[in-house]
């Protein structure tokens, strides 16, 4: 499968996209700084052109790091593009080093055996949806109607990946499990999980 990480300079000059190869630099970024686009593609698709078009269309005035993977699911190919915000602490790394790569929790595969279909996580002020261990959707639930965000998130994945809500394994942080939330998940595969201690007070 295709897996690449690219860096774009401040002017977003597409001609200066550069593949990152060096494994020595580890960067951890905040969840809110990741933007995900998922596109259905075919084997003849020019991936680089798709990436360039996405950057031009959605992030013209934004300086991101870009990580993308091709995922095969239900006999279809999907291009998953992660636009990763780069704050001031890391910008100097982009200019000081010719090549480096990224390592951070949101893009790492978890235990692949727990991702037979789709996994939905609600914890630490965000919703994350994984397909076969790949993060394909990330949304903040801060200052939001949680049930509305849950429904909206699942509908988009059902449509894109042709997966039913009954195929999901739901992992919900215990602080979110109020009565109305429990009622919504009634009859579905629901697991209670723990979040980060310092975020409990914000929920």
Predicted features along the sequence, with ranges:
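Hydrophobic/aromatic-enriched cytosolic interaction surfaces used to assemble or bind macromolecules
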Residues: 1-203
């Amino acid at each position: 499968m295709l897996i690449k990480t690219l860096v774009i300079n401040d002017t977003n000059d597409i001609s200066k996209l550069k593949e990152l190869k060096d494994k020595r630099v580890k960067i951890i970024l905040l969840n809110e700084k990741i933007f995900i686009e998922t596109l259905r593609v075919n084997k003849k698709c020019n991936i680089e052109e798709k990436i360039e078009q996405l950057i031009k269309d959605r992030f013209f005035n934004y300086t991101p790091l870009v990580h993308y993977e091709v995922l095969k699911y239900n006999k279809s190919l999907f291009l998953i593009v992660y636009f990763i915000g780069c704050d001031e602490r890391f910008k100097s790394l982009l200019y000081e080093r010719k090549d480096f790569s990224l390592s951070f929790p949101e893009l790492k595969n978890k235990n692949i055996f727990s991702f037979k279909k789709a996994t939905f996580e609600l914890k630490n002020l965000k919703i994350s949806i994984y397909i076969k261990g790949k993060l394909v959707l990330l949304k903040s639930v801060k200052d939001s109607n949680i049930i509305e965000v849950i429904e909206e998130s699942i509908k988009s994945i059902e449509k894109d990946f042709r997966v039913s809500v009954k195929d999901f394994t739901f992992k919900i942080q215990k602080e979110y499990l109020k009565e109305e939330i429990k009622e919504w998940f009634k009859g579905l595969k629901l697991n209670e999980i723990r979040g980060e201690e310092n975020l409990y007070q914000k929920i």
